[in-house]
Amino acid sequence: MPAQISSEDQQLSTKIAERLKRDEAGLVAAVVQQFDSKEVLMLGWMDDEALRRTLRSGRVTFFSRSRQEYWRKGDTSGHIQMVKAVALDCDGDALLISVDQHGPACHTGTRSCFDGRALPAFVEPVFVEPVA
Amino acid sequence: MPAQISSEDQQLSTKIAERLKRDEAGLVAAVVQQFDSKEVLMLGWMDDEALRRTLRSGRVTFFSRSRQEYWRKGDTSGHIQMVKAVALDCDGDALLISVDQHGPACHTGTRSCFDGRALPAFVEPVFVEPVA
């Protein structure tokens, strides 16, 4: 007699699936943050199955919009992301994935996908006390 | 003679616009992070004009997917986001907006839109040394 496999192992639980507000492609945005330094490493996309794999396996899996396929981060590069925690935002269209990132998160070799990519911006004037 | 207004004041600069990889609705994801605590506060959406306003004004402006209109964060609630820095990721489909958030970021009253909204997840087993 084969071992029973619960439907929860095969599909994202209904309770979570009901809270997702997917875009027209069936995806939600997934913000990936290093758990200790709090650095934002990258943003990827997940459908129900990518989220299920991420929650069940301890490794982050995305759905690639350009390649239209699942990719488990690090399978090619070795730069894996071990899941520390996952949260879904108030309106269900964004996930925050807390991870331990091994090596650089970015395919260009930088630690985060935002490193060295600042845009020119006007920021709030800061009041500076004259040095006495 | 009226003051000259450069095209840069009216439109997002071509240099930045060329780097954006917009979705089918013309939007990129914008991750908002508190500049000092590094907490991820929320995720919003920006088109070219919302990004231009954010870069030029020092206040974060999003484009609402549900209401199909611009909203400058805090205009209704008072919970404004002052821009500290903006970066665009390696493939141009995500922005990281570093801000000083006044009050809660979430419309539900929590500091971040992810607070108290964790999903059950399997995480990497952690090796614990027995206490001697």
From Swiss-Prot, chains A, B:
GO terms for molecular function: magnesium ion binding; phosphoribosyl-AMP cyclohydrolase activity; zinc ion binding. It catalyses: 1-(5-phospho-beta-D-ribosyl)-5'-AMP + H2O = 1-(5-phospho-beta-D-ribosyl)-5-[(5-phospho-beta-D-ribosylamino)methylideneamino]imidazole-4-carboxamide. Keywords: Amino-acid biosynthesis, Cytoplasm, Histidine biosynthesis, Hydrolase, Magnesium, Metal-binding, Zinc. Binds 1 Mg(2+) ion per subunit. Binds 1 zinc ion per subunit. Its main location: cytoplasm. GO terms for cellular component: cytoplasm. It is an enzyme of class 3 (hydrolase). InterPro entries: PRA-CH, PRib_AMP_CycHydrolase_dom, PRib_AMP_CycHydrolase_sf. Catalyzes the hydrolysis of the adenine ring of phosphoribosyl-AMP. This is Phosphoribosyl-AMP cyclohydrolase. The lineage of its organism: Bacteria, Bacillati, Actinomycetota, Actinomycetes, Micrococcales. The gene is hisI.
